[in-house]
Amino acid sequence: MEAIWLYQFRLIVIGDSTVGKSCLIRRFTEGRFAQVSDPTVGVDFFSRLVEIEPGKRIKLQIWDTAGQERFRSITRAYYRNSVGGLLLFDITNRRSFQNVHEWLEETKVHVQPYQIVFVLVGHKCDLDTQRQVTRHEAEKLAAAYGMKYIETSARDAINVEKAFTDLTRDIYELVKRGDITIQEGWEGVKSGFVPNVVHSSEEVVKSERRCLC
Amino acid sequence: MEKMEPSRQEVQPAACKASPPYSLESLSKKHCQNQGNLLHFDRQAPGRLTTSPTLRRLRSRGCGSVRGGARGTATAHAPPQHVALEVRTWCDLQEYPGSASPLSNKCPPESEHIWYVCVDTSRFYEHRRSSVVLNLPGLEVFPGDLLVSAGAADYLCHPLLLLNSESKKPRWPFSKRGVQGKDKNKHISDLEDCLSSLKITDFRDYEFHTLKIFMNTLKYLQTHEYLLDVDLWRLFANLEELSQTSFGFVNSLFHIFKDYVDICETSPSLDFISVLTKYFRGSLCQSHQTYCLNYSAAVFYLESLKQRHDFGIYLKWCEQHDQCRRLHLPELLVAPLHRLTRYPLLLKNIWKRSTDSTEKIMIYSIKEKVEKAIQDLEGKVKWLDNFQKFRHLQEIVVWPPLWDRDKRFFIPECLKHIFKEHMAENILSPTNRHLLYEGKLTLAESTRFLDVYLFLFDDFLLVTKTKRNKKVKKLGGSDPGLMCPSLTAELQTVIREGGSCTVIDQPIPLDRLLVRGLDPLHVSVFGLRNAFLIQHENRYRQCIAAFLLQAQTENIKRTWIAQITAAISRFTKSQETKKLSSFPLPAEPSGI
């Protein structure tokens, strides 16, 4: 039976406040752009399926960290349960770019002993006239940390899909190669889900072993 | 930190007004006679809560009329899909003189017991699932609250099971009760049976309802004498209170909007500011703070509990519930934290859209207040982390006396009292210093390699050798749940094994310390890799100690050198400013 998804990856989106984390996630998961962001209370994460190859789907569980930028001592606990992350800065805000280093250091400490794959995202690229960070220097910084760099815009829907799917594909390759493995007690990568097996709560108990694709 | 104190009330099981065969009088009588000889189970009794799709279908075909709650409290607040709910409050009991049941007699009047029981029994009559509503004196049935089997009624008033009174609560590890081998299997299967007799309402979109599923299931199991030694507070802290406060807030807000929509001609203004003020200036932030302060310790405690088979069964049972959306307890525990951090964002949006200038000022000040609360919390969490960490360090760092440190010094027994050192407590006090960096390295001695653990504080470096002690378990080390989550994995292992970190040499003040990375060419001759050298100089700049340290990787080595160098320069700078200014430094704000 074909799995609905092969794996579930958990991603976090981090970066300074007002760089557009929530907007990027909303654009990706709901396909819309809200002029005024409305943080939905009660929604802890967003989900979307991504098809990385025909028939091969990955479920992404994306955790927004909006509002927690200055609240790190207590939120660090869930860094470690992510396999990947989008590290955002705002291309019209130099400061947010300068803080990228700090964000990386912060996460590096807290994801141990697991590893996390980051992509550097220069957000709000539709505002090119107000640009304060050149593409060249962002690419250099990304390369220094072994990350990919991509420029996106949630407003104009530029590269939003690409940012997420590229990251997903990279993680998938690492999982396929065995560099990242599914581990008990770690939420970063989970194995796939096969439909039509589970009907009721009683049966969930019996068929709790999921298909390892 | 104070624990949640339930209101003092006598236990009074609620009556089942709507379903006459279950009147409390008859119930209690039969309860004392014989449990096996209980009432008929009416699966379609209107008062019965159910998650069964079949039953719901039957009801929606018209056999069960919708009943409002007694006092119209909880049901009125509940979304329309929850109408099958029948709420009973203790007020109803006044109408039932016979309610002085043996159940309540079992309980001492001063008991802090808070359960309300609405019974629908069948457990002993037939092996079908049945339910009891455990309710709180807040008079509302909260979604995610449990429907538990009738057998629970017997245990609910047992003084040993008063969950909120620490002193009375038995802490029996299962081993003490002889649960081993065969018994253990039976214990597990009994636990599974117990869980299978439990159902959860399928209400969604409520205040931390998924978390409450976990909490209430655990409570239920504890009333059945399972997992009694699991500390409910350490896992869920003040969740009950937090959930009620949040629910109250959302509810009041919702009602204001609803009233506004319903009767907008008569009340042109939408006065939700008063609700915002009431809750945000009231207990909402405080409740979140209490919860969040416990959060990291809870996650850590959970990790230690996961090793247990019986706890694992409980977790799996809850996690498989639809409402948990394949999420696990660790990630659900974070929900209240997310909630708190989103409040300023929401308030900011309201502020942006508001047109009235006084309203704008009010909203802004509320937003500021919440942000301040979060900032305070961050400060408190850090402080607590640091405090606990130092407490553990005091425990595991051993300072050998002078004569043990260096055999040159001869101190006769009669003189030893002069050298009584109270070093450990003073030197490792959280108020005096901060731990900047730490980790395991290998120390190259002339004849051997030694496993060492280094602590870099903001004013000195401490080199200790780790000693494993697998036989003797220290008291503090026997319960990993008591350990500090901020300790490194290595130190946790040391503690778990009852080991210690023995100080090798005196602390090296940072202004007397030299660090240099060693050229790979130089040291490879001696079979050393990723090595660096630490020198300790005395006041006259003479070297009095040297440590040749080896790191696992080149990266770790570089980090160590960078950390030490940065600490030295910070320390020197702070010394200079101390000398320059005769004024004391201003106190740090709580958030830093």
From Swiss-Prot, chain A:
Query: Where does the record say this protein resides?
Result: Cell membrane; Cytoplasmic vesicle membrane; Golgi apparatus; Cytoplasmic vesicle, Autophagosome membrane
Please give the organism: Bos taurus
**Record's keyword terms, sorted:** Autophagy, Cell membrane, Cytoplasmic vesicle, Golgi apparatus, GTP-binding, Hydrolase, Lipoprotein, Lysosome, Magnesium, Membrane, Metal-binding, Methylation, Nucleotide-binding, Phosphoprotein, Prenylation, Protein transport, Transport
Q: What is its EC number?
A: 3.6.5.2
Catalysed reaction equations from the record:
GTP + H2O = GDP + phosphate + H(+)
Protein name per the record: Ras-related protein Rab-39B
What PROSITE patterns does the annotation carry?
RAB
Annotated disulfide bonds: none
Phosphoserine modification, residue list: 201
One annotated GO molecular function is: GTP binding
Q: Which residues carry this modification: Cysteine methyl ester?
A: 213
